[in-house]
């Protein structure tokens, strides 16, 4: 009886040890697989991050150099979608912000700091050009001026208003016409014509929309004003 009991004990211990060994081996395999998957996922994530194209301020195509402000803007689309003006990744004017309107939309920015000074829109179809002229005259030297049309930005423009905008660096303002699409970035006190201007004429033969040309867009890097 003692021999039989001892034999049972030996068998029980052997079964326990075998079971423990098998479980430990399976657990180790699962741990190795889990760690392998973890490392594989980490490597894949690193590859995705390294191949994902970088995003620059305002969604422009390349980074701006130091002491420059990134900007991107678009004119309105027909009389349906308002213009959009972005500077340094901050949307200054848009339909979502509910601060755009028919006519010429204007954002004024401090040329040294990039801080927003004011946003306005002036109805050049059914409005009066006089408030727009007074607004243009009051712009201080060193101010960055960004403009974009929506619907019609030209009907009420007179020679004085066009001259004041030309003094900000615009070339196209002299022949901006009814329902043309136009975006412009210039500055008060600028000594040369601005390189930042796009203009599409309203032409029934080439218009993208019925009665309006396609949206005009522009992006770039504005030099920061230095003392």
UniProtKB/Swiss-Prot annotation:
It comes from the Eukaryota. Keywords: Cytoplasmic vesicle, Developmental protein, Disulfide bond, Lectin, Oncogene, Secreted, Signal. Transmembrane segments: none annotated. Disulfide bonds join 58-86, 64-221. The keyword Secreted applies. The keyword Secreted applies. GO terms for cellular component: cytoplasmic vesicle; extracellular space; Golgi apparatus. GO terms for biological process: epidermal cell differentiation; ERK1 and ERK2 cascade; gene expression; inflammatory response; keratinocyte proliferation; neutrophil differentiation; phosphatidylinositol 3-kinase/protein kinase B signal transduction. It is found in: Secreted; Cytoplasmic vesicle. GO terms for molecular function: carbohydrate binding; cytokine activity. It holds the Pfam family ILEI. Residues 1-24 form the signal peptide. Residues 67-225 form the GG-type lectin domain. Belongs to the FAM3 family. PANTHER family: UNCHARACTERIZED FAM3 (PTHR14592). May be involved in retinal laminar formation. Promotes epithelial to mesenchymal transition. This is Protein FAM3C. It comes from Bos taurus (Bovine). The gene is FAM3C.
């Amino acid at each position: 009886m003692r021999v039989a009991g001892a034999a049972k004990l030996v068998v029980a211990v052997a079964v326990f040890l075998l079971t423990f060994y098998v479980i430990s081996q399976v657990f180790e395999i699962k741990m190795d697989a889990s760690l392998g998957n973890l490392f594989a996922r980490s490597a894949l994530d690193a590859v995705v991050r390294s191949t994902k194209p970088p995003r620059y301020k305002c969604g422009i195509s390349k980074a701006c150099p130091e002491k420059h402000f990134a900007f991107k803007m678009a004119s309105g689309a027909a009389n349906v979608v308002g213009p959009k003006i972005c500077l340094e990744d901050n949307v200054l004017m848009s339909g979502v912000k509910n601060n755009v309107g028919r006519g010429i939309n204007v954002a004024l920015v401090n040329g040294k700091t990039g801080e927003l000074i004011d946003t306005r829109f002036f109805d050049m179809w059914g409005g009066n050009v006089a408030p727009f002229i007074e607004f243009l005259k009051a712009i201080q030297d060193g101010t960055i001026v960004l403009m974009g049309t929506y619907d019609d930005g030209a009907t009420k423009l007179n020679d004085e208003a066009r001259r004041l905008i030309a003094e900000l660096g615009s070339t196209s303002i002299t022949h901006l016409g009814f329902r043309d699409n136009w975006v412009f970035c210039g500055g008060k006190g600028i000594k040369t014509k601005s390189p930042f201007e796009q203009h599409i004429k309203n032409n029934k033969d080439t218009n993208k929309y019925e009665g309006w040309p396609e949206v005009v867009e522009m992006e770039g890097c504005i030099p920061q004003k230095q003392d």
